[in-house]
Curated annotation (Swiss-Prot):
Presence of keyword Cytoplasm: yes
Modified residues (Phosphoserine): 2, 133, 140-141, 148-149, 159, 164, 210, 218, 223, 264, 281, 285, 368, 405, 422, 425, 480, 543, 622-623
GO terms of molecular function: phosphatidylinositol-3,4,5-trisphosphate binding; phosphatidylinositol-3,4-bisphosphate binding; transmembrane receptor protein tyrosine kinase adaptor activity
A GO cellular component entry from the record: plasma membrane
Swiss-Prot/TrEMBL domain comment: The SH3-binding motifs mediate interaction with SHC1 and GRB2.
Lineage of origin: Eukaryota, Metazoa, Chordata, Craniata, Vertebrata
Protein name as catalogued: GRB2-associated-binding protein 2
Compositional bias (Low complexity): 140-149
InterPro entries noted in UniProt: Gab1-4-like, PH-like_dom_sf, PH_domain
Length: 676
């Protein structure tokens, strides 16, 4: 055993071969000794031997150049999948070591981190010892989880209403939602507590209610007027129950609920039916006769329940005659925000109960929603509620977009009607955007576009500009943000089809473009990339339980500068093979810095004496010192580098010297031949 330093830790570890040889070489078991040189003045090293009786180490790892230590790595290699792997990253190489037990790994990691000065060693090793327990289950009890989720829910409600959709994450599981109800009722206004009391009586809808109570709490609380109007239902919580009854999961199953609940659940704008029970307006049978309860309707009801699309798609999939349901939708939105009595007469005040004549739809001012322009009052409320759509989750937006596009698909005949009569209007642009089906000239096209708008971050500001302008114009919300911007600025809508059609085509084109790129990937470089990936996969990689410790940058720089010289001498003692190459390269720094040779760099001139003498001739005409450093690199490289780096005078002088040598040799050789 080689001495030098106090022994801190010893034991058997399996060592990885170099990264480039992981596929060909085996992981061999070696005897490791960790030595600390603080007391003796020697460097801190980690040595490994062939066995515990060997006297000469196979390699000495200088820990002064240790940059990082990772514990708890994961390895895909079969024989090492369940092993305890940690690594030591140095400036030269990364050593992957495998311990037999987790305690051994923690012991080695803690010792190495203490020697290297990693302050995080103690608390990280403590956390490493608890890795198994942390991986099997959460440490907090369900009560703590519920309390924390309640706290987050309360904060998000009060401070960040724009993210109020996030509390739904805590209400997917019934146990958490049961704990949340008292907290929600205490933190929410009194009106919302009343809704909770109503929904608590519905045991069969617990799953839907558990989700929607968080969503409805978060989204309805953003509109105080909406909550107040819901609470003014004279004891009827139908509207509140409707949102909580269907949630996300009970939407396709309206048959489970009563007529009241179905009306309010599947057609919230039409839930005038629910308001009608209270205010004496629309009846449930009226909405039932319209076959409203299609599968696509619930997603739009979900948007309305979020306080966004209170006036949009709900009536579109009801029947092919969905145009005359829009007045009721807008009338409900007016009732929902202003609590006016929504009677069939009120709906007739806006557009007639039947689809408007083609002459109304030809107004190029409002574009595709030909039925909506007369409802400037109701469209005002739409514009007021639509900007909230930006706070919807992306998942909800995608659902709404899919549902609304399906709704539009059901009415191609209306697309044909409006395609002929609105060639110069915005519906032509919509028709080019969704060919053959989207030119619905009414809320069909508008609803699918409304569902797509939440994905545009700037839609809120554009909608604000629309509200400042024409109210009926704000009803139409195109899917494309560029076209929407032109519409809000009042530009002629006839120019939009040119932009909208190609833009949609460009969105469809990327798959073919990607397919065209695939043949290039199948070229010769592909196997090389796959080979590189396999090599990377064969390396241990970090997992969620991996803990890392690294040295501070300034500490490492100071240590590296302090121990810059020992690395060359260290490599001499580490291995016999390749010592001359390892020593020859770093020893050039002393040669270039000072002409005085040292004892360690003496072997270098012996091996390449001719090249050194030849370069010495190149140094003579050069007075400034900066030119010497580039020339020293030519000791191990080709002489052409010197000709590129030196100036013309140096090059000419060197050529003259070479010519003189050749002349002398040529003149001396014939004379020798003559003497012979």
């Amino acid at each position: 055993m080689s001495g030098g330093g106090d022994v801190v830790c010893t034991g058997w570890l399996r060592k990885s071969p170099p990264e480039k040889k992981l596929r060909r070489y085996a992981w061999k078991k070696r005897w490791f000794i960790l030595r600390s040189g603080r007391m003796s003045g020697d460097p801190d090293v980690l040595e490994y031997y062939k066995n515990d009786h060997s006297k000469k180490p196979l390699r000495i790892i200088n820990l002064n150049f240790c940059e990082q230590v990772d514990a708890g790595l994961t390895f895909n290699k079969k024989e090492l999948q369940d092993s305890f792997v940690f690594d030591i990253k140095t400036s030269e190489r990364t050593f992957y070591l495998v311990a037999e037990t987790e305690e051994d790994m923690n012991k080695w990691v803690q010792s190495i981190c203490q020697i290297c000065g990693f302050n995080q060693a103690e608390e990280s090793t403590d956390s490493l010892r608890n890795v198994s327990s942390a991986g099997h289950g959460p440490r907090s009890s369900p009560a703590e989880l519920s309390s924390s989720s309640q706290h987050l829910l309360r904060e998000r409600k009060s401070s960040a209403p724009s993210h109020s959709s996030q509390p739904t994450l805590f209400t997917f599981e019934p146990p958490v939602s049961n704990h949340m109800q008292p907290t929600l009722s205490t933190s929410a206004p009194q009106e919302y507590l009343y809704l909770h009391q109503c929904i608590s009586r519905r045991a069969e809808n617990a799953r839907s209610a558990s989700f929607s109570q968080g969503t409805r709490a978060s989204f309805l609380m953003r509109s105080d007027t909406a909550v107040q109007k819901l609470a003014q239902g004279n004891g009827h919580c139908v509207n509140g129950i409707s949102g909580q009854v269907h949630g996300f999961y009970s939407l396709p199953k309206p048959s489970r609920h009563n007529t009241e609940f179905r009306d309010s659940t599947y057609d919230l704008p039409r839930s005038l039916a629910s308001h009608g029970h209270t205010k004496g307006s629309l009846t449930g049978s009226e909405t039932d006769n319209e076959d409203v309860y299609t599968f696509k309707t619930p997603s739009n009801t979900l948007c309305r329940e979020f306080g966004d699309l209170l006036v949009d798609n709900m009536d579109v999939p009801a029947t092919p005659l969905s145009a005359y349901q829009i007045p009721r939708t807008f009338t409900l939105d007016k009732n929902h925000n202003a609590m006016t009595v929504a009677t069939p007469g009120d709906s007739a005040i806006a557009p007639p109960p039947r689809p408007p004549k083609p002459s109304q739809a030809e107004t190029p001012r409002w574009g595709s929603p030909q039925q909506r322009p007369p409802i400037s009052e109701n469209s005002r409320s739409v514009a007021a509620t639509i900007p909230r759509r930006n706070t919807l989750p992306a998942m909800d937006n995608s659902r709404l977009h899919r549902a609304s596009s399906c709704e539009t698909y059901e009415y191609p005949q209306r697309g044909g009607e409006s395609a002929g009569r609105s060639a110069e209007s915005m519906s032509d642009g919509v028709g080019s955007f969704l060919p053959g089906k989207m030119i619905v000239g009414r809320s069909d096209s508008t609803n699918s576009e409304d569902n797509y708008v939440p994905m545009n971050p700037g839609s809120s500001t554009l909608l604000a500009m629309e509200r400042a302008g024409d109210n009926s114009q704000s009803v139409y919300i195109p899917m494309s943000p560029g076209a929407h911007h032109f519409d809000s600025l009042g530009y002629p809508s006839t120019t939009l089809p040119v932009h909208r059609g190609p833009s949609r085509g460009s969105e469809i084109q990327p798959p073919p473009v990607n397919r065209n790129l695939k043949p290039d990937r199948k070229a010769k470089p592909t196997p090389l990339d796959l080979r590189n990936n396999t090599v990377i996969d064969e390396l241990p990689f970090k997992s969620p339980i991996t803990k890392s410790w690294s040295r501070a940058n300034h500490t490492f720089n100071s240590s590296s500068s302090q121990y810059c010289r020992p690395i060359s001498t260290q490599s001499i003692t580490s291995t016999d093979s390749g010592d001359s190459e390892e020593n020859y390269v770093p020893m050039q720094n002393p040669v270039s810095a000072s002409p005085v040779p040292s004892g360690t760099n003496s072997p270098a001139p012996k091996k390449s004496t001719g090249s050194v003498d030849y370069l010495a001739l190149d140094f003579q005409p050069s007075s400034p010192s900066p030119h010497r450093k580039p020339s020293t690199s030519s000791v191990t490289s080709d002489e052409k580098v010197d000709y590129v780096q030196v100036d013309k005078e140096k090059t000419q002088a060197l050529q003259n010297t070479m010519q003189e040598w050749t002349d002398v040799r040529q003149s001396s050789e014939p004379s020798k031949g003559a003497k012979l």
